[in-house]
Amino acid sequence: MQYEAVIGLEVHAQLLTESKIFCGCSTQFGAEPNTQVCPVCLGMPGVLPVLNKKAVEYTVKTGLAMNCKIAPYSRFARKNYFYPDLPKGYQISQYELPLCEDGYLEIMLNGTKRKIRIKRIHLEEDAGKNIHDPSGYSFVDFNRTGVPLMEIVSEPDIRSPKEAALYMKKLRAILRYLGVCDGNLEQGSLRCDANVSVRPVGSTEFGVKTEIKNINSFRFVEKALEYEIKRQIKLIENGEKIIQETRLWDSQTGTTQSMRSKEEAHDYRYFPEPDLVPVVVSEDWIEKIKKDMPELPDQKIERFIKEYGLPQYDSEILTEEKALSEWFEEAVKLGGKPKEVANWIMVELLRLLNEEGKDINECSLKPIQLVELIELINKGTINRNTAKEVFEEMYKTGKTAEAIVREKGLTQISDDSVIIEAIKEVMNKNPKEVERFRNGEEKLIGFFVGQVMKITKGKANPKLVNELIFKILKE
């Protein structure tokens, strides 16, 4: 029997507000433990929360970007559960009346668009962080307690681990474009829980689901889901029951481990938060937020295709990061041809950044430097192979292309007499290959070009080398 996966994702995004959701404490990451706390976020008796308006604005902005209906009236609720990192014994969240509902995101898979519905986006406070010491003691850092958190809940529309990763990437790109979340999975500012079940292909009923926690990279989203889907199918085929539970992804072993039984909503005993008035979002406020919305990834992809004549694939790569798309456009404004600039970014620049685990914001190379390098190629000062060497040196040192070419003596050889001399040297060393070429094996042209480039240390003009070899060998 064939099975299909049914996947829904719950994504928690920490909002880039300067202060926490219900108090004035800083949200800065990396401070000394328990230095960014106050009686409000520590849940001391008698304190009252005051809602951070910017957190509401960011949530509404996200809802609009994800095609949601914005609730004119929403309400906070207390979610009751006991855990060491929750000082009040409850979390202020939203339950029955969230800020945003009924939205969707579109992902592109194998050239086909897939719509993933978004059930709701609600606002809540984050919990603290448990730190487990090797000595056997556990500590709690409450700095994160009360940091504004947006929970984005998808419908169970995702059908494969690949789709789940694409959805996550798209969602993170939108959050970064909006400037509401930095999307850092490693630091925990973007966290993902996955609900997954399997069912026979063609069935419309849902299977028993498990929730997977501790997924902190796009690669692990795929790997965790792949493992869990296989585990569930194996249980079914062995006649065993799947237990509704929360499981922890272990990246070291590549497996999911049972953590606890999965809670239902009634286990949390939700009730309206008595210390906060309902949130009212007026049409005027929504219109004001709409006017401040930036160009989003999908809109930018469409524009890059129309304005610059780029293929869909190139446009998608260049718009994954807002800063990367801006780097590309700056280079084009400075005179670079769009496709040429795109190729250098996608092949060389991204390769070097990935090797160092950096993003474009950490890159010291400027768009003008790439444009100047391309000009040297087009003028015939250097060839493309040499240009790759120059580009890498530019990336490492920050020097201009012209300075590197001058210092290293990389100027392209376009003097016929010098190239002819090199060709004759190759012919004298390889008489058998010359004879084979003259007998019709013209595919050997690549061999001769390679040998000439070797003698000239890659500096000969490849086009001229090609032309002269044909001319001389045909004599």
Curated annotation (Swiss-Prot):
GO molecular function annotation: asparaginyl-tRNA synthase (glutamine-hydrolyzing) activity; ATP binding; glutaminyl-tRNA synthase (glutamine-hydrolyzing) activity
Pfam family name, one: GatB_N
Biological processes, Gene Ontology terms: glutaminyl-tRNAGln biosynthesis via transamidation; translation
PROSITE patterns noted in UniProt: GATB (PS01234)
Keywords of the record: ATP-binding, Ligase, Nucleotide-binding, Protein biosynthesis
Catalytic activity: L-glutamyl-tRNA(Gln) + L-glutamine + ATP + H2O = L-glutaminyl-tRNA(Gln) + L-glutamate + ADP + phosphate + H(+); L-aspartyl-tRNA(Asn) + L-glutamine + ATP + H2O = L-asparaginyl-tRNA(Asn) + L-glutamate + ADP + phosphate + 2 H(+)
E.C. numbers: 6.3.5.-
UniProt-listed InterPro entries: Asn/Gln-tRNA_amidoTrfase_suB/E (IPR017959), Asn/Gln-tRNA_Trfase_suB/E_cat (IPR006075), Asn/Gln_amidotransferase (IPR018027), Asn/Gln_tRNA_amidoTrase-B-like (IPR003789), GatB (IPR004413), GatB_C_1 (IPR042114), GatB_Yqey_C_2 (IPR023168), Gln-tRNA_amidoTrfase_suB_CS (IPR017958)
Superkingdom to which the source organism belongs: Bacteria
Record-linked Gene3D superfamilies: 1.10.10.410, GatB domain, N-terminal subdomain
Broadest EC class assigned to this enzyme: ligase
Subunit structure: Heterotrimer of A, B and C subunits.
NCBIfam families: gatB, PRK05477.1-2, PRK05477.1-4, PRK05477.1-5
Function per UniProt: Allows the formation of correctly charged Asn-tRNA(Asn) or Gln-tRNA(Gln) through the transamidation of misacylated Asp-tRNA(Asn) or Glu-tRNA(Gln) in organisms which lack either or both of asparaginyl-tRNA or glutaminyl-tRNA synthetases. The reaction takes place in the presence of glutamine and ATP through an activated phospho-Asp-tRNA(Asn) or phospho-Glu-tRNA(Gln).
Similarity-based family: Belongs to the GatB/GatE family. GatB subfamily.
HAMAP family cross-referenced by the UniProt entry: GatB
Name the UniProt record assigns to this protein: Aspartyl/glutamyl-tRNA(Asn/Gln) amidotransferase subunit B
